[in-house]
């Protein structure tokens, strides 16, 4: 087989040449507030590290890095819950299905707050070559549906990772939108063997995981990046609305020295008259209707 030299699922188009979409409620800045809720296996290498092993020797269990993640669930999640609760924020939980059993009080709080639940794998681990991906994805979606009473409409792979089959499997399981393909500031249609699904904007540039765990940015840098992004988006509203994703992880954004910057950012966005907060499904429904009206 010849190598694919272009995107096999989302046709290429310049952002400023897309059909004009009517903004939701006349508000061109669409904010998607996301809380990633993950289950890191205790007996496996962690997905990310805050501390390397002494003398470069890594050991299992990796107690400090596992504890870093669990601190987020124990102490960081209450802070994120409070931000959303106090402001009545529409929120999407990108949930490892394994967290339902591993962290039942967190899973129940998400249910009580009526957050949208988006599939995010079973544990925070990409699908292995030796695994039955179709069975694993079905298990994740079924598990969430059983606990929350609603099948997830959206999906983000652990680490945004996929195989060549992932979108086809997700479409066959009824998933409407996929967040792994971070390639535009508005949704696109993605082709699958089972019909089109929505390629939903997410974020890497404004994601607390690469910013803090990889790039070692400061909290002030995080806040300024959002301010600078919105300033650019404002110049583009005449062309089309823009989606601003606030992607958080409790062990990163839920720590005491960062949470205040998140509160400040959200409060400033809430004070704008051109801004609307929406869940992933609300954005998907808006896009379906707006795209149909524009074509």
What are these regions (language model features)?
Residues 2-198, 223-246, 252-295:
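Catalytic alpha-helical scaffold of carbohydrate-active enzymes acting on polysaccharides/glycoconjugates
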Residues 192-210:
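A structural motif
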Residues 204-225:
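Binuclear metal-dependent hydrolase catalytic cores centered on His/Asp/Glu-rich metal-binding motifs
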Residues 209-212, 247-251:
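Active-site-proximal beta-alpha loop/turn segments in soluble metabolic enzymes
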